[in-house]
């Protein structure tokens, strides 16, 4: 393999490993924090905090206009040109827009605080706390602006440090305040966490030297218009997903009861949070890298395929392990009473492998700022998911929801691929097809074993498939980036 290709694969692997580690650390800190909060505040306190956060997040989802995601594309594209004036202008526009949208969120929460209190708590007793908390929308949006610059300029180590230190300080500041003030510590803790995050983001982003340029309000509007359009599209996608999730949970509750909702929620969290962290880790570097070359379809094709190969070799072994040992995972993360979610999560594991294939293509639509196309694709995907899930649950219960999840991503994968093929002459490399295809077949094999066998035979055959998946993954990584030499060099440096 050529030096350039090896370097490219190593860069992808390093970024994925870096942010994968950060994701794991975030989850561990969140678990520890949740335990402390549960003990110190009790169920009522946790409920109050959750209602505050839900109300604020609802407004933030609308007022932020998706800038935290969409602006990364513009900063990355400017950075890819190495034009210092363009970089400076783009960063300045982003920083102005986050002030405007942050102030908008603050004003909306402050003005609607009586309504938020009434809707969230059923009374007006929490109007003043909502007014005080409105400042967090401005602070969080300013933090998001600094993270956009770090991600867009591909200062990945600084972004990782900022994230890791942020959750650490969140834990360190929260526990003493909750211990000292109890429920009364919720508002000051939420504000202090936001302030800590902003300070950390500012300390790291200020390391990036950007020229001082004058940008008029008209220039801000002109250059920011595309960011806002794409950002609103991303926000709408999130709103579609929220609506579908609400309708689906209501349907499950009406037909199966609240326990069924809990089982579905537990399985959904495992897939999106714990398994989904691989995709979150990949996306942090993949998105700005793809955005920087979005005008070159050939380079985009190569980048998507290379990213897909690395991701498949990491995700495949992870999903085969989950399929075989999911009952133990459910017991560790929840309890024996959640074992009924096993069939749902089993089918959803197949869905996650299919989702990854579609996901790496769908980033092309965002990187190329195809806002209308992105909205159509995401809206159709949500419609598919709702229809498949309602029918699946109606006829097969919780297992049907898992089957629906897998079926959704078969259709979504084909849809994304055909659109990208027609618009950008996109096609996967033979290397990706071979690598992804083998790992997908191993996931299907594991699913079949889990469905057909039980007891020691299931674990014997399942472990054999896991071993094959791991062997092929490690061998594939070693072939592409000389993994063993890479690891040895890292250890030697330490």
What are these regions (language model features)?
Residues 1-12, 201-245, 285-302, 423-437, ...:
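Interhelical loop/hinge segments that connect adjacent transmembrane helices in multipass membrane
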Residues 2-4, 447-494:
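Membrane-proximal transmembrane or re-entrant/amphipathic helices at the cytosolic face
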Residues 12, 57, 96-246:
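Hydrophobic transmembrane helix module of multi-pass membrane transport proteins
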Residues 15-31, 166, 190-197, 201, ...:
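Transmembrane helical elements of multi-pass membrane transporters/channels
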Residues 35-36, 47-64, 93-96, 233, ...:
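Alpha-helical transmembrane segments of polytopic membrane transporters and translocases
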Residues 65-81, 152, 210, 267, ...:
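Helix-loop junctions and terminal segments of transmembrane helices
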Residues 92-121, 171-172, 179, 278, ...:
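Alpha-helical transmembrane segments of multi-pass membrane transport and lipid-handling proteins
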Residues 138-162, 349-381, 420:
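Membrane-interface junctions at transmembrane-helix termini in multi-pass inner-membrane proteins
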């Amino acid at each position: 393999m050529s030096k350039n290709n090896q370097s490219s694969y190593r860069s992808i692997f390093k970024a994925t490993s870096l942010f994968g580690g950060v994701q794991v650390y975030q989850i561990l800190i969140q678990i520890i924090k949740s335990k402390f909060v549960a003990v110190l505040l009790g169920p009522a306190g946790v409920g109050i905090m959750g209602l505050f956060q839900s109300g604020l997040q609802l407004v933030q989802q609308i007022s932020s206009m998706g800038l935290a995601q969409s602006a990364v594309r513009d900063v990355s594209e400017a950075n890819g040109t190495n034009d210092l004036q363009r970089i400076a202008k783009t960063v300045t526009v982003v920083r102005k827009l986050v002030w405007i949208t942050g102030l908008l969120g603050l004003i909306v929460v402050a003005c609607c605080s009586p309504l938020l209190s009434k809707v969230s708590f059923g009374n007006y007793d929490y109007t003043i706390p909502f007014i005080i908390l409105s400042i967090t929308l401005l602070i969080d949006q300013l933090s998001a602006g600094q993270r956009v610059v770090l991600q867009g300029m591909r200062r990945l180590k600084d972004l990782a440090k900022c994230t890791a230190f942020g959750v650490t300080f969140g834990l360190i500041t929260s526990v003493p305040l909750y211990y000292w003030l109890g429920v009364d510590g919720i508002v000051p803790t939420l504000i202090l966490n936001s302030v800590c995050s902003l300070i950390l983001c500012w300390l790291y982003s200020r390391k990036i030297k950007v020229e001082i340029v004058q940008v008029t309000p008209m220039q801000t509007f002109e250059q920011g218009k595309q960011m806002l359009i794409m950002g609103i599209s991303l926000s709408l996608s999130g709103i579609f997903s929220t609506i579908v999730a609400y309708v689906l949970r209501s349907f499950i509750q009406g037909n199966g009861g609240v326990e069924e909702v809990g089982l579905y929620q537990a399985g959904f969290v495992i897939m999106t949070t714990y398994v989904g962290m691989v995709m979150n880790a990949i996306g942090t570097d993949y998105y700005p890298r793809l955005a920087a070359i979005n005008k070159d379809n050939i380079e985009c094709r190569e980048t998507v395929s290379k990213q897909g190969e690395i991701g498949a070799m990491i995700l495949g072994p992870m999903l085969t392990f989950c399929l075989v040992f999911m009952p133990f995972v459910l017991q560790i993360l929840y309890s024996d009473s959640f074992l009924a979610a096993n069939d749902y999560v089993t089918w959803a594991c197949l869905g996650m492998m299919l989702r990854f294939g579609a996901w790496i293509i769908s980033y092309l639509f965002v990187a190329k700022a195809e806002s209308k196309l992105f909205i159509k694709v995401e809206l159709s995907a949500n419609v598919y998911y709702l229809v498949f899930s309602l029918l699946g649950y109606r006829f097969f219960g919780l297992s049907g929801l898992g089957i629906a999840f897998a079926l959704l991503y078969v259709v979504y994968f084909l849809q994304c691929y055909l659109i990208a093929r027609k618009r950008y002459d996109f096609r996967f490399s033979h290397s990706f097809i071979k690598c992804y295809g083998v790992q997908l077949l191993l996931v299907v094999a594991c699913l079949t074993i889990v469905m057909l066998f039980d007891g020691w035979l299931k674990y014997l055959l399942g472990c054999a498939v896991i071993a094959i998946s791991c062997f092929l993954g490690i061998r594939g990584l070693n072939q592409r980036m000389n993994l063993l030499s890479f690891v040895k060099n890292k250890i030697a440096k330490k």
